[in-house]
Amino acid sequence: MQEGQNRKTSSLSILAIAGVEPYQEKPGEEYMNEAQLSHFKRILEAWRNQLRDEVDRTVTHMQDEAANFPDPVDRAAQEEEFSLELRNRDRERKLIKKIEKTLKKVEDEDFGYCESCGVEIGIRRLEARPTADLCIDCKTLAEIREKQMAG
């Protein structure tokens, strides 16, 4: 696997992918105004495009690297590498769907509010995780419930 293809995406790299600086709120500025929606639309579109490029590179890499190794160990190693790449791409495919769902919310001007309680999620949280659909309090409660159900 090529270096850089398997990196974790932090909030700073998401902003860097989009080529934008963290949003600077102005005093008294209305939450999720046109400028903020545009800011997040740029971030989400750039992130989605970067993930799509990763998928395309994986397909090309797998086609270029596919070889019928006579040695079973070499063949097994290649199959394991391809399997790992496909699992990563499957996760990215699911993330692309979530990004597209979030872009629809931006278009509908329904972005940035908690789906559970309706409060503002907040600019900084959304820059860290643009697909967040719960405020930090509701997300914390959901995680506590999830742990209780699992344990």
Swiss-Prot record:
**Which Pfam families would you find in this protein's record?**
DksA_N (PF21157), zf-dskA_traR (PF01258)
Q: Which segments of the protein form a coiled coil according to its record?
A: 34-54
Q: Does the keyword RNA-binding apply?
A: no
Q: Which InterPro entries match?
A: DksA_N, DksA_RNA_pol-bd, DnaK_N, Znf_C4-type_bac, Znf_DskA_TraR, Znf_DskA_TraR_CS
Q: Which domain of life is it from?
A: Bacteria
What GO molecular functions are on record for this protein? zinc ion binding
Give positions of the dksA C4-type zinc fingers.
114-138
Task: Tell me which Gene Ontology terms the entry assigns under biological process.
Answer: regulation of DNA-templated transcription
Q: Gene Ontology cellular component?
A: cytoplasm
Residues reported in the UniProt entry to bind Zn(2+): 114, 117, 135, 138
Which key words are in the record? Answer: Coiled coil, Cytoplasm, Metal-binding, Zinc, Zinc-finger
Please verify whether the record's keywords include Magnesium. no
Q: Where in the cell is it found?
A: Cytoplasm
Task: Tell me, in one coarse class, where this protein mainly resides.
Answer: cytoplasm
Tell me, in a sentence or two, what this protein's role is.
Transcription factor that acts by binding directly to the RNA polymerase (RNAP). Required for negative regulation of rRNA expression and positive regulation of several amino acid biosynthesis promoters. Also required for regulation of fis expression.
Q: How does it assemble?
A: Interacts directly with the RNA polymerase.
Q: Which family does it belong to?
A: Belongs to the DksA family.
The protein depicted here goes by the name RNA polymerase-binding transcription factor DksA
Gene name for this UniProt entry: dksA
